[in-house]
Design a protein with these regions (language model features):
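Secondary-structure end/capping motifs
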Residues: 53, 255-333
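Short, glycine-/small- and polar/acidic-enriched structural segments
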Residues: 37-186, 191-195, 210, 239
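A ligand-binding cleft/hinge motif common to bilobed small-molecule-binding domains
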Residues: 110-122, 176, 209-228, 318, ...
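Conserved C-terminal helix/tail region of periplasmic/extracytoplasmic solute-binding proteins
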Residues: 327-363
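Pocket-lining segment of extracytoplasmic ligand-binding domains
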Residues: 192, 198-286, 384, 391-400, ...
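C-terminal motif of bacterial Sec signal peptides marking the signal peptidase cleavage site
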Residues: 25-29
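A bilobed periplasmic-binding-protein/Venus flytrap-type ligand-binding module shared by bacterial periplasmic
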Residues: 141-151, 241-257, 419-421
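Bacterial signal peptide processing site
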Residues: 31-34
């Protein structure tokens, strides 16, 4: 058995999705919710997406920790604050409520953020991106999956097939770009089904959709449940994707201290997640009903998502590139991304640490095992080391995670595509990347997970 490094894993970042198609709904009301009350009591309304777990530091986890309420209580301005947390399935209704003046602060994915900007400008109710929750610099938060027994093995195989996605979401953007690179027309080359994630997942299981392109946490959830397998790793695009926090401009101007209190609380929640990744995963799982193993895949110490409130230039640049995809789909017109981004509040909230955090990059993903009954995971030098441990402790393993050999995207070890190359055992999220590696390395071959375990033991 190869050497095992047994030490608690801790995300190596500085301590401090979801999106769906947006229907341009009519304005239903006016007046900010943060202006409610009798003069001494103010209600702040926060819209979030509990199951879009890339936003937990501005939603599910933040709410459970109570940090925002504590920050508001520490303002000492003689005002009694109440927080109204409103949970939504996608970013679209959050945007609708923000432009109606009913939500003050919201969180959503990159493509819905752009629609949030466009909708706010259209209605004269501008909003601004004020912080980031979680991101992946290569695009690994979005994945295209097929049914477990599907014979589809590449993007080219999707020609003429029914593909479910949520139009206007980051997952839709991944689908469009991936198909374009593969030489498949994203409009006429497939039959696109515009569906909410849960509906698309059901369609995939029922056989009425041949593939599903979705955002965190749906691909990982379906793979974990044995209801899907990965066809395309969004990180193959090598384009950043992220989720962020948006605030109404009038709210930010009227109550800047409240917005800064929220961003300070978000930074605290980020620090908690970094320092207690397993506990955070368990907490989010309890609140959402998602398996903790799936939450950890995305939000864990070496998860697919890196959490950091700073608004990094690379993410802003990616947002600018996303505009063309939305315009081509006739979901928006031109969007002034520079005008939409307003990082002054998060700069004040983070203080001197902001500049250092802004340039920080995530560490490479690592192989991890989550032992049953453990409150910490263990990290391994190589995927082969992890396999050797799993082979000897299979009954004691809650979950095992390995990074894709080419993209770094973390995936479940028993759901990965494995390649044997000499003494090396290499995991891949999708079959196409595994085949590409085999084609470029003489003697390398695809093996089953069972064979990989045997080779490692």
């Amino acid at each position: 058995m190869k050497r095992l490094v047994e030490r608690p894993v801790k995300r190596q970042t500085l301590t401090a999705a979801g999106a769906a198609a947006l229907l341009l709904l009519p304005l239903t009301a006016c007046g900010g919710s943060a202006e409610a009350g009798d003069g001494s009591t103010v209600t702040v309304t926060v819209g979030y997406q509990s199951k879009t777990i890339n936003t937990v530091t501005a939603g599910t986890l933040l709410r459970s920790l109570g940090y925002f309420e504590k920050q508001l209580g520490a303002l000492g301005d003689g005002v009694t604050y109440k927080v109204d947390w409103q949970d939504y399935a996608t970013g679209a209704p959050i945007t609708a409520q923000m432009t109606a003046g009913k939500i003050d602060i919201g969180s959503m994915g990159d493509f819905p953020l752009l629609i949030n900007a466009a909708r706010g400008k259209q209605l004269g109710k501008p909003t601004h991106l004020v912080s980031v929750t979680g991101y992946n610099l290569r695009g690994g938060l979005n994945t295209i999956v097929t049914a477990p027994d599907s014979e589809l093995a590449s993007l080219e195989d999707l020609k003429g097939k029914k593909v479910s996605t949520s139009v206007g979401s980051a997952a839709d953007g991944t689908l469009v770009r991936a198909l374009q690179r593969a030489g498949v027309d994203p409009v006429d080359g497939i039959e696109k089904l515009n569906q909410q994630p849960a509906v698309g997942a059901s369609a995939l299981s029922a056989g009425s959709a041949d593939a599903l392109s979705q955002f965190v946490a749906w691909p990982g959830l379906l793979a974990f449940q044995g209801k899907a397998k990965a066809l395309y790793d969004g990180a193959q695009l090598d384009l950043p994707t992220f989720h962020g926090v948006t605030a109404r401009e009038d709210f930010a101007k009227k109550r800047p201290a409240v917005l800064e209190a929220f961003l300070k609380a978000q930074a605290q929640a980020t620090a908690y997640l970094d320092e207690h990744p397993v506990a955070a995963a368990e907490s989010v799982a309890k609140a959402t009903g998602l398996p903790a193993e799936v939450v950890y895949l995305y939000n864990g110490a070496h998860g697919i998502s890196t959490f950091d409130p700073t608004v990094k230039p690379r993410l802003v640049a990616a947002l600018e590139e996303d505009v063309s995809v939305l315009k081509a789909a006739k979901l928006t017109g031109d969007i002034d991304v520079d005008a939409f981004v307003d990082d002054r509040y998060v700069k004040r909230a983070l203080g001197a640490s902001y500049a250092e955090r802004l340039t920080a990059t995530p560490p490479p993903a690592a192989s991890e095992v989550w032992p049953k009954g453990a409150t910490e995971t263990r990290t391994f030098t190589t995927p082969a080391d992890l396999l050797a441990h799993v082979a000897g402790h299979n009954d004691g393993i809650r979950a095992a995670y390995v990074p894709d050999a080419t993209t770094g995207t973390l995936w479940f070890a028993d759901r990965a595509v494995w390649v044997a190359d000499g003494e090396n055992l290499l995991p891949f999220v999708a079959p196409a990347t595994a085949r590409a590696y085999v084609d470029a390395h003489g003697g390398a071959r695809v093996v089953t997970y069972a064979d990989a375990l045997e080779l490692a033991s």
